[in-house]
Amino acid sequence: ANCVAKNNEIYYENVVYDTAGLIKQLGLDLHEVAKQIANEGVRGPFAPDFKKTKPKRKISKLKPISYEIPNNIKNLREFVHAVYDTIWNRRNFSALNNAYANNVEFEGSTGRKFKGIDNLRNFIISMVACFPDLALSIEDLYWMGNAQDGYLVSIRWGAVGTHKGNGIYGAPTNRECYLWGITQWEIKNNKIIKEWTGFNELAILIQLLADKKSSFNFDKINNRG
């Protein structure tokens, strides 16, 4: 969750639930549950206005602006944008070595947990392989800390892409899909040493697995997940 508080009261909050992880813990087939929700119109994990939060940058063949990932972080905001635009949007996966520690620890949605920059690279490539035209934008960015002691960073992001590749979400459906999530970093000595990323994995599957004849209306769903 991302929360903004004033005078000891939270007045702005964004939450991502790991509903997919919960379904797997219950011993249910995640893909079958997602397909059932999509085809039966069961109230699911979308906010009623979720499409209004779609990424600001549309799918395009044009490459995003190039930012160099600095060796020494002097401007945290520029560092965050450089990491996302260089690695996710420009597909420069070798740049992970400039941003992450070799033994980075990762925890993510649906029980993902691993250690090491190579495993992180494999995860990112697996996502981009499913959505080759994926376009990601940063919606909110918060941090605390300094260059000497390190930083704690929270990033709310959104992405849009077309499911054109084989991979963890099955055979290509050629459907446009919205992704959103919250990522938190711990940074020490100018490198990301820990990452926590929660994203809407059940919602991704719901968007992809609905039968073509389904009358499922995503705009009317009134729960988050």
Ranges and model annotations:
Residues 1-225:
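C-terminal and inter-domain tail/linker signature
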